[in-house]
Design a protein with these regions (language model features):
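Structured, active/binding-site neighborhoods that engage oxygen-rich ligands
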Residues: 1-264
Length: 264
């Protein structure tokens, strides 16, 4: 989960100010956590406490305003009855990483990813995006190879992952939909040799930088099974006491597991 938060923070200055070279400053004074982190931690909190996803997502968004939430999501937060609004935006995928770390079977992961998405993003593509990211994290942390993950996600969700970042960048434009941003973020993980490398790959897409880096960072952390002290030392001080508490409690409970072989 820290990989997702690191990606969000690193990508935050570049969402509307794209980079052109991969050696851009990873963290700087303009970096901050955005809605990606807030809602990721809302999902983590819901899992830790056994609470409703929608309730926690709405509550956290109210208590942490002005973090870059979408307009339709903002209206959902303020509504008295909070009905899902048929979204296929990547908001469902950006917040789902805790699901991939917390649950122990493919069936549970896909079920919980759907539940975490459909309180807002009940469009099939919105649900698919959340499930694809959660499944990638589950597969990565249970020992699947990158090729196995590619084949599983392509087969299950119909995403075209047989592309290179170099080819994608030639024509890629800013896209906040699941179908137009999640596959590319997953490919950023495929071409990475570390969490930092995955985050840089995602930001260099020159798209929805914080969200795609959030997605790529979460998957890559699960794959390598480690998180550098340098990143931790930078990220945690940017979070308040409540958020630090959620991160530590969640990681203590769910992020210490050893990898096992993913069954076909």
């Amino acid at each position: 989960m820290l990989g997702a938060i690191a990606g969000d923070i690193a990508g935050s200055p570049y969402e509307f100010d794209p980079v052109t070279q991969k050696d851009f400053p990873m963290f700087g004074p303009s970096c901050r956590f955005t809605d990606d982190t807030v809602l990721t931690l809302a999902v983590a909190h819901a899992i830790l406490k056994g609470k409703d996803y929608g309730e926690c997502i709405g509550s956290f968004a109210i208590r942490y305003p002005n973090r870059g939430y979408g307009a339709r999501f903002g209206r959902w937060v303020k509504a008295w009855d909070r009905q899902p609004y048929d979204s296929y935006g990547n908001g469902s995928a950006m917040r789902v990483s805790p699901v991939g770390f917390a649950f122990n079977t493919e069936k549970e992961v896909l079920k919980e990813a759907k539940k975490s998405a459909e309180c807002t993003h009940n469009h099939p593509e919105g649900i698919k995006g959340a499930q694809a990211v959660a499944f990638a994290i589950y597969a990565a942390r249970t020992g699947a190879s990158k090729k196995d993950i590619e084949n599983e996600i392509s087969g299950r969700f119909g995403y075209d992952l047989d592309r290179t970042l170099a080819k994608i960048r030639r024509r890629y434009k800013f896209d906040e939909t699941c179908q137009g941003s999640v596959p590319e973020a997953i490919i950023a993980f495929f071409e990475a040799d570390s969490i930092e490398d995955a985050i840089r790959n995602a930001i260099l897409l020159r798209g929805d930088a914080d969200t795609q880096a959030c997605i790529a960072g979460g998957i890559t952390e699960a794959y390598f099974g480690t998180f550098s002290k340098n990143l931790t030392d930078y990220i945690l001080p940017l979070l308040n006491a409540e958020f630090q508490g959620i991160v530590k409690a969640f990681c203590k409970k769910y992020c210490h597991r050893q990898k096992t072989v993913l069954k076909a």
